[in-house]
Amino acid sequence: MFDNLQSIKERHLDLERLLADPDAAGDQTRFRKLNKEYSDLREIVETYDRYSHIKKQLEDSRQLLKNEQDQEMKALVEEEIEELQRQIPALEQEIKVLLLPKDEADSRNVILEIRAGTGGEEAALFTTDLFRMYQRYAEKQGWNFQMLDYNESSVPGGFREATISITGHDVFGTMKYESGVHRVQRVPDTETQGRIHTSAASVAVLPEAEEVDVEIRKEDLRLDTYRSGGKGGQNVNKVETAVRITHMPTGMVAACQEERSQLQNKERAMKMLRAKLFDIQLAEQQQARADLRRTMVATGDRSAKIRTYNYPQSRVTDHRIGFTTHALPQFMQGEIGELIDALKMHDQTERLQAAQQ
């Protein structure tokens, strides 16, 4: 696994020279591609440089120990050798993880879908809670979080479903572990006997697709317009600005009502539809791989119960990795980074074990 590190370092230097060329920015498509490759390799090269530096220090210290006569100096050198030896395994592990094949979709933006499941009005309120949790997490990450479409429930403040666009750095690579069924246990405000009710919401995280990723024929689409309930000034409920697009071969539907014009809503609905079709395409490719890993973390199985939010115990438990926190209020305020980091680490460990078999 370490054999190609030197060639990676040489490629990184080549890219640095190419990007420094004043003519490089002339072709923006090529420039962005080179810049992304440079960024992807930088962390590997920097970690490898630290590793090489420590290995050199270790070699020098061992040589010094052989020639040193002073006992106090020998003791100091032995301490230094011990400390350097402690650092090497962690760096080796870090390099192995960095060398794992990257999921090309990780750098993409996301279409996030949250839908109320079992539990009636309480499920709709929980869907809103999840919406706000992800909105606050996106703000902390510096991402752009934009509502695309929603269906309100009969209970004030509740969503039957919501569709959101999230754009920023490595959004899919961070959010992909959220796909699945989220279960909540709490006492509803309307419950007079104090009984705990269980309800659920499903989350789907779809990587945003480019036009080149998915071929969509115009004749396969049905476009319907309707009156928007969203923003739009005087147009609201007067002009049919909202758009619903149906992909006839698959039955996939995408709708948008949040923009002010029908054209803008159509563009966003097409973006949502491309993401849905691209997600099907990616799932088929993954299923076809001989090395398909069958863990829920890896597959993002949306029918799988992945997490429980227990309000009486102020507890959040992720069932895939056995992670538990008793800081539920903070978690619902978007403090979900610790869990996402743990899920990433678990995924990397599994992939590393598979690569070494």
Curated annotation (Swiss-Prot):
In terms of InterPro entries, this protein maps to:
PCRF, Pep_chain_release_fac_I, Pep_chain_release_fac_I_sf, Prokaryotic/Mito_RF, RF-1
* Family, similarity comment: Belongs to the prokaryotic/mitochondrial release factor family.
Protein's recorded name? Peptide chain release factor 1
Stored PROSITE patterns: RF_PROK_I
Q: Does the keyword Protein biosynthesis apply?
A: yes
GO cellular component terms, A-Z: cytoplasm
One Pfam family assigned to this protein is: RF-1
N5-methylglutamine-modified residues are: 234
Q: What is its main location?
A: cytoplasm
Source organism (scientific name)? Chlorobium phaeovibrioides (strain DSM 265 / 1930) (Prosthecochloris vibrioformis (strain DSM 265))
Q: What SMART domains does the entry give?
A: PCRF
Tell me the compartments it is located in.
Answer: Cytoplasm
Keywords on record: Cytoplasm, Methylation, Protein biosynthesis
Where do the coiled-coil regions begin and end?
none
Q: How is it modified after translation?
A: Methylated by PrmC. Methylation increases the termination efficiency of RF1.
Query: Which GO MF terms does the UniProt record name?
Result: translation release factor activity, codon specific
